[in-house]
From Swiss-Prot:
This is Zinc finger E-box-binding homeobox 2. The modification N6-acetyllysine is found at residue 377. It is linked to Mowat-Wilson syndrome: A complex developmental disorder characterized by intellectual disability, delayed motor development, epilepsy, microcephaly and a wide spectrum of clinically heterogeneous features suggestive of neurocristopathies at the cephalic, cardiac, and vagal levels. Affected patients show an easily recognizable facial appearance with deep set eyes and hypertelorism, medially divergent, broad eyebrows, prominent columella, pointed chin and uplifted, notched ear lobes. Some patients manifest Hirschsprung disease. Residues 1-101, 702-740, 771-810, 832-857, 1117-1214 are annotated as: Disordered. GO terms for biological process: astrocyte activation; cell proliferation in forebrain; central nervous system development; collateral sprouting; corpus callosum morphogenesis; corticospinal tract morphogenesis; developmental pigmentation; endothelial cell migration. There is a cross-link at residues 391, 479, 555, 611, 632, 713, 866 (Glycyl lysine isopeptide (Lys-Gly) (interchain with G-Cter in SUMO2)). Sumoylation on Lys-391 and Lys-866 is promoted by the E3 SUMO-protein ligase CBX4, and impairs interaction with CTBP1 and transcription repression activity. Residues 12-24 have a biased composition (Basic residues). GO terms for molecular function: DNA-binding transcription activator activity, RNA polymerase II-specific; DNA-binding transcription factor activity, RNA polymerase II-specific; DNA-binding transcription repressor activity, RNA polymerase II-specific; phosphatase regulator activity; R-SMAD binding; RNA polymerase II cis-regulatory region sequence-specific DNA binding; zinc ion binding. The gene is ZEB2.
Amino acid sequence: MKQPIMADGPRCKRRKQANPRRKNVVNYDNVVDTGSETDEEDKLHIAEDDGIANPLDQETSPASVPNHESSPHVSQALLPREEEEDEIREGGVEHPWHNNEILQASVDGPEEMKEDYDTMGPEATIQTAINNGTVKNANCTSDFEEYFAKRKLEERDGHAVSIEEYLQRSDTAIIYPEAPEELSRLGTPEANGQEENDLPPGTPDAFAQLLTCPYCDRGYKRLTSLKEHIKYRHEKNEENFSCPLCSYTFAYRTQLERHMVTHKPGTDQHQMLTQGAGNRKFKCTECGKAFKYKHHLKEHLRIHSGEKPYECPNCKKRFSHSGSYSSHISSKKCIGLISVNGRMRNNIKTGSSPNSVSSSPTNSAITQLRNKLENGKPLSMSEQTGLLKIKTEPLDFNDYKVLMATHGFSGTSPFMNGGLGATSPLGVHPSAQSPMQHLGVGMEAPLLGFPTMNSNLSEVQKVLQIVDNTVSRQKMDCKAEEISKLKGYHMKDPCSQPEEQGVTSPNIPPVGLPVVSHNGATKSIIDYTLEKVNEAKACLQSLTTDSRRQISNIKKEKLRTLIDLVTDDKMIENHNISTPFSCQFCKESFPGPIPLHQHERYLCKMNEEIKAVLQPHENIVPNKAGVFVDNKALLLSSVLSEKGMTSPINPYKDHMSVLKAYYAMNMEPNSDELLKISIAVGLPQEFVKEWFEQRKVYQYSNSRSPSLERSSKPLAPNSNPPTKDSLLPRSPVKPMDSITSPSIAELHNSVTNCDPPLRLTKPSHFTNIKPVEKLDHSRSNTPSPLNLSSTSSKNSHSSSYTPNSFSSEELQAEPLDLSLPKQMKEPKSIIATKNKTKASSISLDHNSVSSSSENSDEPLNLTFIKKEFSNSNNLDNKSTNPVFSMNPFSAKPLYTALPPQSAFPPATFMPPVQTSIPGLRPYPGLDQMSFLPHMAYTYPTGAATFADMQQRRKYQRKQGFQGELLDGAQDYMSGLDDMTDSDSCLSRKKIKKTESGMYACDLCDKTFQKSSSLLRHKYEHTGKRPHQCQICKKAFKHKHHLIEHSRLHSGEKPYQCDKCGKRFSHSGSYSQHMNHRYSYCKREAEEREAAEREAREKGHLEPTELLMNRAYLQSITPQGYSDSEERESMPRDGESEKEHEKEGEDGYGKLGRQDGDEEFEEEEEESENKSMDTDPETIRDEEETGDHSMDDSSEDGKMETKSDHEEDNMEDGM
């Protein structure tokens, strides 16, 4: 056994307490203090008893308040103990507690722990420290026995709860924690004791081996811990702060203040702990919580208001605090499981993302569904019914989508080999590539006549109400029929869905629950919200013969409504279906959807797509210029033709409904939302962005169409109704709504508002119609799609725009071909002759635009044949030429989605090679992307010069929206400055005010108090910069920006500081200097003194002469001299200013360096000048101009300057 270490004496003597109040403390002198290296000592447990009451507590605290700090447990016998100790003290009972010293007791070793420390027994004894078998201080032991025996009898009479009884209880004890400072001070022996106190006692004699604090009854197994506890908690002096309730002492007042919180009620503790010492000024009025910063209080108030402004773009989870949102985004746990190609990533599990169904606490039903699907078990009827109850909010749609995509419901679902007739749920055709078609999985069982159909009608109505409000809010300006077209279509496409039976039958409810729309038409929830996302390509084999007969009758009724648009042959082909799975091309029957898809997609010889692949040279028709269309134009035309593509092999048809559904909910998605949409539909993000932009333009043109109904009426009674092959690919308007909606050409003509009403001409006016072989209307790779550039950008000759050249005639005299392939038209000269108009004609002829309802084979001509005006400015150029080339600046749009307004200035403003007019970039051959930023800013249509424009304004009044903007001939033209600065024909004085007197932007919902502010704002939509620098070709939005920029090239500095004499070229730089640097800039007197000193040293220049030279050098800065290069070149000579002053030549070098420093400060001031100029792009452009706008002469000058410095350095080195 390890020999014990003898203590020299009382090691924790209370030396600084003059008059201690505590009388009942036992002291053991010369006891053994052993180490605790053994594991047996660590097995001892601490019991903290409330057996010894503190006389201080009796005097300072009410008896009804329990002393929570003295013990971690609730004491139920505090009052009887206090009374008993009062009787002992009043009775004059004295105890031999020697010299008022504290208890020192320790156990020598584990072998000598043989007696119990049973404070609860009637014969209470205490095991004293044993040293070599000798018991010291026997008198103290007997006193302890007598004291505890009497005390225990009194406690039994008071029904006190003993420690033994307390430890045997099975209920939960309430533990009041201590202040953080107390537990963290010097190892905190109390904290260790409290942790060990939570452990159950291992042996019955564990409490006999503890050392108890005589002040607060805490127990410790090591003497050092007890000493530290008494020293830091009970030892008092003048510098310590003592708790008046529990006699704890603290070295700092802040510790005492935090400790006092523990004596407060529980509701007040949190408030007092969070409030600092007067530095939390912002207090919540709801809960009283205070904050140091105001923005913390603002975020905290959202907890009470329920506001959650931050939304995750991936999982749609909302957050009230920006920190929570940021951590959620940075964790990247909600990234979707669907990759770009629509397939699941193999290395990601279903439950590893918040998009998975297990992440939502309300998705227990989906979780069960996922578990069953993972185990490969088919769903029962009741489980399929329960799927309808899973979601009540459309925002949680991603969970269900990811679940369905995870288990492959796009075609290879577990139901394929299950008990549902070997077909996918709802008969969804495996060729349907829509990534959202799995919404209808498992819904056919309760919808085939089972009584569970109406159980979820309330939830469906909630979803419909939400979607209804969203669509109505975004489409407030549209008419009722336009809103209904956006939200859902009442009739499905009969040509595209020959096997659609079972989904639209009234007896067999559609996918989802039937609901009634505003006009009484019955349609499904899925069709209502996602616009036919789940269109079925084949019907269920389990349908009965009666249901097929009823569906066939319904199909016939639907086809009668399209009698004016579809030929009789097409109708017979649509509803004469022999078997559910028959090829739509050759009518061959197949046993199931998979063989049918295989045949239609790859094997059917009647499929035009397969023909095009097998015989590409026969079907592909080159463009007018001999250039094939590019993929981007093909993709764009395929999407714009929307309902014209319904073949199962078409890769874009299934995405249109999804894209329009997203568009209905958010018309302007950000980049994150675009990425999410692109992942959902499996298309590139650039494509989705382009689609949204063009959809916006189309909706804008729809909402501003005043003659929408008028132009749509003549469509029905037509002698030559077009086939769907020629009609559908031309217009985004769906074919079944063509009776009540105009074609895209009439929409554009009605929006134009600057021309007479559309004149419909027969196709025989300018073509020889020949019967064309009937093609599949859903072809996605049409050889002649929407050609946005008139020619390919690589082979285009329109950049060198020469109206009389053969290339211009060859490329642009024909209208753009937007239809399917057709045979060659008449010669172009005939077209030019027939479209020729008389000189000075004001009304514009629309012969080149054919009605889609009257012409079945002719393309929809959306361009405009260039008109000729007999004006003196252009007669010498065009009067002798009978051939008309296409005017790229005409009033007609070059593709469907553009508003029919001219996006570029008249042709006179564009020289053949390259324009020098400010704001006009080189014309890149009608590049489709260059149109978008200029859509909203139009130049007068058809005019070639200013004189033309003024002359036309005299005779013609613009109609509608454009006329309101352009009305007023006197205000229209005030010279080239107004043409460029005021955005051409958008006269500032004629911009309409709103009802509140504000100027509203027609492209967004912003309003402005001044028309100039509105024009400045509109530059943000177009990106137009009409003012261009002639030297460096840098363009600016405003004329005064160009003026100040030109001073960088000219060296002009009209602004000068009156104190330091520094000059500035920009007003912003000057204002910045005067506001921030005027107080410490150099004084003019100092400059004069420096000049005189230089003059005295050089001897050949007078001070006034030197000042004049300096002023001259400051006023003429070399053009394009880069400040950064100046700063790099100037410090290369390691000469001091004095060395420069000694040489006459170097004096001018110093002046140049000072000038460079001034330029550097000027540029720095310009970069800081955010308040003086509201356009930060202008500041950035001007800063860049300073670095990159040097011409050749300035380059040469700069090189010469550098060489001069190098020569100076060499001379100095020698």
